[in-house]
UniProtKB/Swiss-Prot annotation:
Name the record gives this protein: Ferredoxin--NADP reductase
Source species of the chain: Anaplasma phagocytophilum (strain HZ)
Cofactor names: FAD
Superkingdom, taxonomy of origin: Bacteria
Lineage, top ranks: Bacteria, Pseudomonadati, Pseudomonadota, Alphaproteobacteria, Rickettsiales
Keyword Flavoprotein assigned: yes
Annotated residues for binding of FAD: 36, 44, 49, 89, 123, 290, 331
């Protein structure tokens, strides 16, 4: 498929920052398309933790990840973005007047500027090395929580010691019948406030924390768990824990895919940018959100929102040099019509 029109901006990535970039571009009179390898918008927020509460979005004391995604998508709707989902950009070629992006499914998109808002790129869970685990996946073994109600009055085992493990332990303690947290070490790598809540719930007997233990095996049939076997790292003793669900939170494996071949000077999993404009080393290609790197960078959604505004302001000046921008606050000009 080939889109005949030339978009002002092509946004690579439909996570929260990518969605807000649609809005920022639209507020400056620029139309856009959004390309993402996932079938749904929202990135990790929608796929890995839609019901996880987020506390550091300005104006929201608390908002779930999915509600944030829904609000951002609704905010972008007046600008009628074209969503090209379930596809990733394989190549970028540059002509005299525009870029041409080719996806893995043969879609061709023309645009005048590109904003990469791809987060950490493609992602997938780090699967624990347990025999037969794939038989249970998406039945009684999950790497994310999409609906907390699934675990109501159930026996749940959480494995891991990072933010996801600790956050979900605290949240699922409100609904689970029994909740176990399995961790190899005494220390957890999570926010201090979350750790405090975790310890309080453990003291109250609402969470059973097993340290130093690791996963050793699964027991069940037809994809339904009966128990999770854990092993004491010090004594090597193994014990079964009755369980309906196992949630292994060992992080995700990120993959930037073809982005590393776009001539953007990728370092690790990030693209170096000019802090004030989010320009990359290629003209008219920008990077925002977690994938953008500069001295002092903080990986927060709200920082990505700011970067989206900076990039769109610069793109508008580059694409329309003869049309000065009369800056106005949104409270004064409202939502423009493209």
């Amino acid at each position: 498929m080939e889109y005949s029109s030339v978009f002002d901006v092509a946004i690579v990535g439909a996570g929260p920052v990518g969605l807000f970039t649609v809005f920022q571009a639209g507020m400056l009179g620029m139309n856009s398309c959004v390309i993402d390898a996932l079938d749904i918008v929202g990135g990790q927020c929608a796929v890995l933790y839609p019901e996880k509460p987020i506390y550091d979005i300005p104006g929201y004391p608390m908002i779930t990840a999915q509600d944030l995604v829904n609000n951002l998508k609704k905010q972008a709707e007046p600008f009628a973005p074209v969503y090209i989902m379930g596809q990733f950009v394989e190549s970028i070629s540059e002509g005299p007047d525009c870029f041409v992006l080719q996806t893995n499914k043969g879609t061709s998109v023309k645009c005048r500027a590109i904003i990469v808002a791809a987060g950490s790129g493609g992602f997938g869970p780090n699967r624990p090395p347990l025999d037969g685990i794939m038989e249970y996946e998406n039945k009684s073994v999950f790497y994310n929580v999409s609906q907390m109600a699934t675990f109501k009055n159930k026996k749940v085992v959480i494995a891991g010691g990072g933010d996801s493990a600790a956050d979900w332990a605290v949240n699922l303690a409100e609904v689970a019948d029994k909740l176990y947290v399995i961790h190899r070490r005494k220390s957890f790598r999570c926010a201090p406030n979350t750790l405090k809540k975790l310890e309080e719930l453990a003291d109250e007997g609402r969470i059973n924390v097993l340290i130093p233990y690791q996963l050793a095996g699964l027991d069940g049939e037809n994809g339904e768990l009966r128990s999770v076997v854990v092993r004491n790292i010090t004594t090597k003793e193994e014990i079964p824990i009755g369980a309906d669900f196992l949630l292994p939170f060992f992080g995700i494996s990120a993959n930037l895919g073809e982005i590393v071949n776009w001539g953007l000077g990728v370092e690790g999993f990030q693209i170096p940018v000019e802090q004030s404009t989010c320009r990359t080393r290629r003209s008219k290609i920008y990077a925002v959100g977690d994938i953008a790197a500069y001295p002092g960078k903080i990986k927060l959604i709200l920082v990505g929102f700011s970067e989206a505004a900076l990039a769109c302001q610069d793109i508008r000046a580059v694409l329309f040099p003869d049309t000065p921008l009369n800056f106005q606050y949104s409270t004064s000009k409202g939502i423009p019509t493209l």
